[in-house]
Regions:
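Phosphate/nucleotide-binding beta-alpha loop and adjacent structural elements of enzyme active sites
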Residues: 1-186
Length: 186
């Protein structure tokens, strides 16, 4: 995948072959194997996430903290790490305090128990406001109910959405002083 990204990305994109976390070291990247082969979109270094898969490919990967990988100012961070969100965020506290970027975080309670609540609390403690988009409406994370917005019966076996069914797993977080509502409304 890294080679494909290098070949297809803009010249200013740097590809790092690492797993972000809250520590430096190594971790096992577990990639579930489906009937059609590897399900890369569900690969994770969170072992409990993929235990339900019949089989997994295991690859040892280096881990690093985002604070050590990116020292430049950044305006936007996207996190999609299949259950490892809180660890990545704890490894990015310096970047968050230094740059105060906007974050887009994918979090699902099916990947890690209370994943959404712990991510919401992490940002609340740092005076960030959070929002999600549901059926075209911008909604504060305080109104998020996983029982409604992350009903697993809305999902296909590969994690895709069933036609006509809503499932919310992307959340925007804005630092104090930045009007997230206005940004998302524009």
């Amino acid at each position: 995948m890294a080679d494909v990204l290098r070949q297809t990305s803009a010249p200013n994109v740097m590809v790092h072959e690492i797993a972000l976390s809250d520590h430096e070291g190594k971790a096992d990247l577990l990639t579930p194997q489906g009937e059609q082969g590897a399900v890369h979109g569900l690969a994770s270094i969170e072992p409990q996430l993929v235990l339900s898969a019949k089989s997994c490919a295991i690859q040892s990967v280096p881990t690093a903290r985002l604070d050590e990988v990116i020292r430049e100012e950044v305006a936007f961070v996207k996190i999609d790490v299949e259950g490892h969100e809180l660890s990545v965020l704890h490894g990015a506290v310096g970047l968050l305090e230094r740059s105060q970027p906007v974050f887009l975080v994918e979090a699902e309670n099916r990947h890690r128990a209370s994943a959404t609540e712990s991510v919401f609390e992490f940002f609340h403690e740092r005076e960030y406001s959070g929002f999600f988009v549901e059926d075209g409406d911008i909604v504060p994370v305080e109104q998020f109910d996983a029982g409604i917005f992350q009903d697993e019966s809305s999902l296909l076996p590969d994690g895709g959405r069933k036609r006509g069914r809503a499932y919310v797993n992307n959340f925007f977080f804005f630092p104090s002083g930045k009007d997230g509502w206005a940004v998302l409304s524009s």
